[in-house]
């Protein structure tokens, strides 16, 4: 069978790679075309566009890049038409993917969606498009099944969270060998995860790095995004006690004592590695003001959303400043606070289900094509 997969972000590349691996194991004649990244490319040939050329975040940033976005939509439609896949698999990235899904459904292609758009947070009206244009939906958060089936009468498959697979499949990291390899000393590590896009990394790192002199007994390591080169981070490395590791986020989290994390998938990854964290976000002021009007959520981090309570502190916009960050980081370095936080992480993992999300999704997709 021929599979066309569209992932527009780093997290989608990770989950897309594991999904491709699963499909290949079940369909020996599988061939692929995809929009994604390096991890998907390691699994198969057929990269059309890399996600680093697709990722625009925030209302204002999208407006400034509309011409590029529409050009990419046109390229995608033409490539799908030329490839004639048996199924198109969309991975999150709703602004782009739902446009393609509407077109693809009219053209007679099978449309499957892995990792639901977060319409339970905002743009719930998109449910009409999803019901009309998506043949099968595979959800990864426990409350999403109830949202779709009970509230909107749209059957979906809850497959568990693929991050559990990704973490379970990785090779274990030896802490001493890791430190030696990357020129680190024996002090506990505080990981800095500033995001994957240039615009957010610059904003986040400026404040994250402002606190390092207050924590001399720790060493700070920036998790460099796979979509960025070392040269991009160079201006941020002019202080002592700051290190950079490119494309080694899981290895870094596995040996970290605490983390400061930009809101997004990384908050859940950090929790699954059982690393106490402070969640932060600072975006374009206009974009954030608009988002606050339309997003109907109590929290921004997946950890708090899934557990439906504030487990990790969230510092957003003006609250994300040097003084608050020092205060909140000090809290999670306290032994008693850490014990309580780690217990909540255990409850989180139980809610997400066990391993096998990628495998289950691959099986459902292959079976649907028989």
Where are the language model's segments positioned?
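Nucleotide-activated sugar donor-binding and catalytic core shared by glycosyltransferases
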Residues: 1-370
